[in-house]
From Swiss-Prot:
It comes from the Eukaryota. Residues 44-53 have a biased composition (Gly residues). May negatively regulate the SNF1 kinase. The keyword Coiled coil does not apply. Keywords: Cytoplasm. Belongs to the SIP5 family. Disulfide bonds: none annotated. Coiled coil: none annotated. The gene is SIP5. GO terms for cellular component: cytoplasm. Residues 1-77, 168-226, 381-415, 463-521, 542-608, 623-746, 778-854 are annotated as: Disordered. This is Protein SIP5. CDD domains: SIP5-like (cd24139).
Amino acid sequence: MGNSNTKESRAGDGSSRAHHGDPGSASLQSDRVSSRRNRVSRGDLGGILGLGTGASQSEPPYERRETKQEREARRLERERVARIAERERSMKEEHVDGGYLVTMGTYTSPEDFNKPIVRQLQIERKVAPFWRGLNDFDDQWTEPQIIAAARGLPVPPADQIPPEDLIPRPLPANPRTEGSSNLDNLTIPITGRSPSTASEHASSNPGSALPSPVSAQAPRANSPFKPRGKAIAAVLGGGGSRNGSTTELMPREINLPHDPFVNGQPLEVFLYKNATECPICFLTFPPYLNHTRCCDQPICSECFVQIKRPDPHFPEGHNENDPNHNPEETAGLLVSEPACCPYCTQPDFGVTYEPPPFRRGLSYSISLTAVGAASAAMSSSSSVNSASLSPTNASPSNGTGRRRNQSVSASSPSVILTDRIRPEWATKLQAARAHLARRAAAATALHTAAFIVGGSENRAFRSRFGRRNNGGSGSALPSPGGVNHGEGENGDSGSGTPSQNDMDQNSRGDPGRGRSGGNHRDRLEDLEEMMLAEAVRLSLAAEEERKRKVSKEERKEAKKREKEERKAAKAAAKQVGPYEGASGRSGHSSASGSTLSLPGFGFGRKRGNSAASNLRIEASVASAIATTESPEANPKEKGKGVDRAVSTHAEGAPATATDPAVLGGSASTSSPRPVPHLPAGPSHLRQMSNASSVTSSILDSRHGSYTSPTHLQDPRSSGLSLGSRSGASEDGGDADRDRDPCASTEPMFNFRSLAQVVGVSLDGENAGRRLSLIEAERRARESGETGSQDSADFGEVETIKTDTATDHADVKPQAEASGSLSVDTAMGRHIKGSPIAQNGSGEVESDSLSPPTVTITLETPATASANDELKQLGSEAAVEPVHRLTE
């Protein structure tokens, strides 16, 4: 601002003055600068504490933490990329006898074997290298085709000239003359050479044989090992035992002189001309493969490194009777069995390897003594002093060599077990056991803590309530000091909180509670109580589950039975049919009944389109079943198959209202009145005569024998159904009651007008009876004349005879329409003006008396004389009371 100096300028001036001033002032200035430097400004402090606000001090964005699965996936991806790069580098720079030290990618699973150990075993020629597998191989291939296939190049046609870089050129190991060099170049390899020629060629070409000890000792000056340490490393690396090869004292790797030919043939041709197939991956490899120690089956190295022990697991499903049973399995620990052979499933899977009779590529620089030890440990075919380099003598698969016919021990030095290439299996097993033990210990501690805490809470709960009950205000027993400790100054005696006096008294009165023995006993008791409560809870839960299952099964069974009953009802309804005739419910109904009676299935005509007949459908099946239980007719009786009632009274006793008299159809024996048939639905009234009219229906019904079934009233109905309920109901005892037209399921409007026309009373105790009959009874009751029961019966019979003769013209159409007519109908007609309605004793005939057992059937005229009575159907029932009276 104007000429004012800024902070920077002042600092600069101060510093310049300090430089040009005296030493005292300079030291003072330096102290000020250091103190200012030590002080922290407010902005810096806010930045440190996160109090600053502004764009430069904004909070960093939230970074999502990587999950374990994502980290594992990234690690596997890094390993895959590194493995691909290492494979490419190793295949270009390293090889062992024409094979490689890295996998060829046959399996894509993670390579969890120990790669340094496998590499060392392959360089030592104890395990076959990773040969390149061929998908297709033909024995007729030429050398250029074999070389191209072995190098992973496209196989050229047989007649095509191979490129110059495809066929290798031999490099002279020692300077030779031009003639010998040209001779070697002009020599054409012949596959059918004799062993002598091959040996001569091997002797003339020292580069194709093993390197001499002099050449092997050439890099002695560059060796990092001292002579003594190198000898120890060679001895340990030579492998006096199975675990002799160690990575800590591994000798130095050297590259043998490069020679692309073996016995004058290219290396690839020598390896693949007698190729064999791996039985596991089905790829073609050179015949120098690993062989199982147990069954001597070939297996490539890439398949061998995939076989391993199973993960640690509990010994479930193992054979406990096995003599070689692992004691760890009995203890319930985690176990991990050795890998089994994929061919014969023998445990302790291992392989042996016989290398080719030459060495190329990498090797270890070892001394002569180590060479002798290694040659003693190795088989004769893989010895460094092997004289023959012919593959026909060294190859175990070409038939000339004798195949091993017995297994090799798992402890043999030449056997490489799967545990050898995965030495960390024991560490994994111990780690799994330790992890399981930690989990078990944590669970035990958690449960113990829960028991202890729960026990202490239970003890405190019991002690609180116990003290409150013993020393509280509600206790009848006083406290030892005469003071009620439950009534404190706050008056919270019911709160359950102990007072200080109670605590002191309990501590003084029970000094042993704080001891360890008492606490231990309390914990044990609490544990037992908790276990008992848990057992009871589990038992109750199991019982509830059982009851629930039982109820569920019962509901299923009930539904099933209900469904079966409905099916049976439907089948019975179908079997009965729409018309009930001679084959209907009782099999003895008349022709008119079979013609005019329609059951309640809804097939008949409905008067006024009434919906009340729908209620009769349910009763049809029950009535059909009830009628099947009716008593069969006596075959000795006369008549055309007419049902007659079986009297249960004595022969001399008169018939009462309880005598079931069937007048044309079967009915239940419990019914007070017989019915001609059982139509559950409305009848064709226009086809019926006066027998089915309102008059006959009313006169056929006895007074008081029917009460209105209020549960069958249907407010949806409109119209009138007459005589629709003449059949037996579901209980088989409401036949007469259902015949009452006033008890019909139809509503009562439109019925009064019809009742007035026909002269029927609808109200009072005489509902459903003719007005003329009611008037006759009233007059008879006023006259007071009575008579004996016998004379009344005789008068009724005579009345029937006379009235039947006079009204024969009216009865016959009724019989034709309904098939039967009850006797009380004729009685009702005669009572109107006949003097026989009053007997000699002055007793009045009423409807409560039972009708005589006289049946008037179809086409049967009334009897006119005593001689003609014998010709009437059912004459025994009609004449028998007359004979008794006359006698």
